[in-house]
Amino acid sequence: KHTTLKLILELKHHSTPEREDLAAEKIVKMVERMKLQNRVEYITFSANALRTLLKNAPKGTPVYYLNGEMTPSQLKELGCAGLDYHYDVLRKHPEWIDECHRLGMKVNVWTVRNTDVMREFDGRADFLTTDLPAEALKVVNK
């Protein structure tokens, strides 16, 4: 029905790296079984799950890291499509936005619940996670 809709799948932390590995492997297989590979992007706070997703997902599948401590260069070396960090991380490291773009990577900021913050990252971040989509559209469309 909504064949152009992107699906963002977050893999949560698990109690052990082995459980994360198993979850990542099963999730990638499920996405393939449902023939959603071209629509799914993965996000995770876990560096272990990140590596397992990158290893198991089809080459070119967008995988983003959420935790905030890795530099764009580190993420690029792992094979990430970009970073997906809280806006406070990018306020501390504003140079990471340009670095990501120079490396051909995308930038997402989360979770923005304030129009001033939306304006701060408008035109700099590629994506914005928010609970206020109508307000975000007003900022972007100005």
Residue ranges: model-predicted function:
Residues 1-142:
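Short loop-to-alpha-helix "cap/lid" segments that border enzyme active sites
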